[in-house]
């Protein structure tokens, strides 16, 4: 239950946790529609569908609520979308943030396979991962009338080739 985070309070009355990350929606490929999309399992969808009761109390206490996006063993992956694919998927994620009043998106690319071709896909690279972060942040800024975050956990397939990644001026190794 994400509401458990409210129970951890510092001596000054502030919440102990800065953010709760809902784990996880999936980046998936729909072969019949030829489209990358976010798929929520029943547990995540239940949290989203009950946002007013389960997520908004966190936000009212100053705790950010993010939806993590995880690869799901198919060709759609955080670091493998084309520039156009990054823009399209970033817009979808921003719309989800608006619809469910979320504070942002987290990316975790542990389970993508990276074998896609076509207009949605590019070879996996740190540049394409950064592009997806950028396009998502840009779309959230355009749609959401509140501050939004992009969180990066792991870049899976390309992680070992990266000396470090800079996100909002902070180095991550």
Which residues fall in each region the model found?
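Chitinase-like catalytic core of GlcNAc-active glycosidases
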Residues: 1-173
